[in-house]
Amino acid sequence: SNCTDSGTDFQTYEYYNGGGDLNQNAGNNSPLQYVCASSAYARDATGDGIQIAVVDTGINASHSEIDDNMVSALSGSDTINDDDNPVDDEGHGSHVAGIIASERSGAASSGSTHGVAYEADIYAIKIFNSSGNTTNAAKAAGYALIEATAAIDIINNSWGTDADCTSESNCRSTIGTAFFDNWEDVSQLSTPKISVWAAGNEGDAEPSAQCQTMLYNTDISAVSVCVVAVSTSENGDDNSQGKGKIATFSDKCGSVAAFCIAAPGDDIWSLSHSGSSHTIKSGTSMAAPMVSGGLALIMQEFSSLTPAQVVSRLLSTASDDSEYSQSSIYGHGMMNLNAATTAVANLQTINGSNLLDDPNTSYKDLVNNSFTSSAAFSNAINSALEGKVMEVYDSFDRANFEVNINDFFSSSSYVSQNTIENHMARLVPKNKQKVKHKNLYGNFSFKVDENFIQSTLFQSAGDFLTLGYNQSTNSFENAADPLSGFFNDNAFGNKYLVNPYFYTGSGQDYFMSFNGNDTYGFDTFINGNTSDLGLAFNFNPLSSTNGDKKYAGDLQIVLGTNYEQNKFLNSSSTGVFSTGDMSNTNFTGLKYKKNITDGLTFVGSGFAGYTYIDKAKNSYISDSTPLLTSSFTVGLAKSKFIKENQT
């Protein structure tokens, strides 16, 4: 089977009853299962919103299994009797309409069934009288009424002319000049209407004249389908040459193979024109509404497709292997609604000023679109995008599909690198030795803070200024190797306890402070990937130079900004999620450090920042409000917890 297992919930009693066996064991005979209808239902394709005209003997509009899907009769919709009451007094039209759109009620009673597009809307156009006869005038009037009714999307024609035609003019005269012209007109509308035709029931090698007309008029053939009938019964049953094979009565696709498809049409259980009863009928008249219903599912599922593209998708996705490879019999093969409602080729994102109508629109395969968020805000972005979808497009015909946005997003781990989310915790006033060198080019001093194993190289620029260079090599704040197993989501067991801004990478920066007062200073930093640049101002209101506050601890207030190239908050992205050349984050924070004992230090910090995203041209990331991020750290540090040169 070419069907998926995803639609098993839809394989109900009603679903199987279309095969006429009236029990769930008839699954192998179910015409709906033959065309994989349940797979389309699992993708929410039901025909909802699609409007189908049934040009036939009228419809039993009060039947309990289709009454809710019937559109009020159009004025003049009984063209054979020239009135407004297209009641079915023959039975053919009701049966056809039920195959398309009888309702899915969930009933398990004997006889209950449902149509292919069980939520589609149905118009009754009556062109045949109670004896099954019609006129060219009635046929032409029916199509004229359809042309004037903009809402109609699909026209089902379970009838035809048993004749051959060999040119456009010959076909025009064969099927009726006025009718041909009206058929051509509805095919040339700005939004053309799709016409579905029964191939005929003479067992001929060529289908009806209406099907043959498709060979000679490209406007008509672009939005028309010819349908042959297969049997779902075993060989030996009436009309069957073997399960799934062409029915004995059915005309074949012949020269019209390019516009032809197969569907079940033998022993089909559907609605009767009497009360709310049911009956079995066979014919290409029963196969055509299977296809009309299938087209409704495709049209509903892919709102981006034109009617011609809907027809093309139906034909291109038909099952054409094995028996159905014989195009002169089956045309494109057996209708397959599973294949028709899935991607035919690569799915792609799309961007441009007018999307599908823009000749400069660019398409990117899904694998070329990604967004990897830094650990700093992965939790927030995953939560914000949960349940959100975006449209992508099949490169085959630009059919629109919905995918979860989260499928494109991933999160990086807390890695050992010098990044924006780590700098917020790292930006503290440097340890400064009071030196008396007056010469800007005087001697350099060096100091190691054993609490944090952080080296500082600095030089005096007089009594007034200290210039410095800091190199973090193996400190508590960047001890990636010995602490990597501790400072991560898994070790904590709760991702919200991990400080996203905790610095775990080595780095370097330059700083400037004022010798006479180590309460404040400036600090610059360049990240490890060299594409970021930042500046921070540090202020310490509890400076140890103030005797009254000597034992209050070390409190730093940090104000800073950071610029990132082609990313924000250290994320990385490609394709339609790309960002502009320069995003920046303005941040502020507090960091407090106090020696509790000679060997133990309390460390705490809290930071918040606003990130302004630079937009890239044609990116899906646009018009975003500034992102607010925040974090905190609380911990104890032991003196000489990590030794110098530790690996």
Model-derived features: positions:
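Transmembrane beta-strands of outer-membrane beta-barrel pores
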Residues: Q471-S475, T504-S506, G516-Y520, L559-Q565, ...
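Substrate-binding/access-modulating region of protease and related hydrolase catalytic domains
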Residues: T46-D48, G91, E103-A108, A124-S221, ...
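Repeated loop/turn-to-beta-strand initiation elements of outer-membrane beta-barrel proteins
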Residues: D463-T466, Q508-F511, Y520, S543-V558, ...
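Residues on the lipid-exposed face of transmembrane beta-strands in outer-membrane beta-barrel proteins
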Residues: F444, S455-Q459, P500-F502, M512-F514, ...
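Extracellular S/T/G-rich loop segment that most often corresponds to the catalytic His/Ser-adjacent loop
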Residues: D56, T213-A296, Q300
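Subtilisin-like serine protease catalytic core
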Residues: C3, S38-S75, D82-N136, A150-D153, ...
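Protease zymogen maturation seam
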Residues: S1-G49, S64-E65
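C-terminal subdomain of the subtilisin-like protease fold in secreted/lumenal serine endopeptidases
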Residues: N29, I152-N156, V223-C226, Q300-Y414
